[in-house]
Amino acid sequence: MSPTQDGRYATKVPDGLDKIITDLPLRVESVDVKGKFMWWTLTGGDKTWYMWSTYGMSGQWSRTRGKHAGFIVDFNGSGSLITRDQQQLFFNDTRRFGTVKFVSDPKIHAKKLASLGPDILDQPPVDSGLFAERILLKPSRTICEALMDQSCVSGIGNYLRAEILYDCGLDPWRSTTDLTAEQYVQLRNVSIRISTASYKSQGASIKTYRNPDDVKGSSQFSFKVYARNSCPLGHETTRKQDTNARMIHWCSICQK
């Protein structure tokens, strides 16, 4: 593989790119994820590199070059993960919050992975006790803030947060210390169930979503409150920014 810059990185070099260039070409050994964090393991000679990728709000890897392709990976030779004779992958990112970074130090890579909480899609699933313990790491926060903190539990994004809290009947602005043990068990179970349903349906049909073949979502995962004017019971939904400027969607009648 070899990289090409464009879009976001047309003038700004991704961290580590200047160092990995001298070791190219490299072989893609694997592509892995933990929560919303993706990394590629690359090898060549006696060197191992890791290409980190975060999606931001709209980033995605695709076989099709989009209008906002910020980074391009060229595949030349055997060992490519790309099928159908496709020789390139494009990191398309409309809002340009996604990132690409190259790391060769295995200790730095291990530290990054250790900084992330258990993946909500882990098998076997994270147990209820550990789930509550991770959410309560910073007890002064609201439950909507804690669910989005990838160091607590990784893999829950904005639309999942809204749907999980609605199904649990929990007001997003409640303190993490206000929840009972039974509510934490429910929150853990619902988080796993809804995250799994979203994963199996290959995401949501929001306007920016495309799968790697550039196919729009098919509405298999439907929202109850996220981006809705009313909840399934007909109550008007409310939207408000959290402390990280992310919009939280909820029903003030159904969620207490």
Task: Describe the predicted segments one by one.
Residues 1-20, 32, 37-39, 44-48, ...:
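Basic, nucleic-acid-binding surfaces and adjacent catalytic neighborhoods in DNA/RNA-processing proteins
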Residues 1-112, 248, 256:
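Acidic, proline/glycine-enriched N-terminal capping motif
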Residues 55, 59, 111-114, 119, ...:
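Flexible, active-site-adjacent loop/turn segments at secondary-structure boundaries
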Residues 70, 88, 110-113, 128, ...:
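Hydrophobic, well-ordered secondary-structure segments
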Residues 85-91, 115-123, 142-150:
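Short, mixed-charge, low-aromatic patches
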Residues 92, 101-103, 128, 158, ...:
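A short secondary-structure junction signal
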Residues 95-138:
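A short, charged helix-loop
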Residues 24, 75-77, 86, 123, ...:
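Short linear motifs in intrinsically disordered/low-complexity regions
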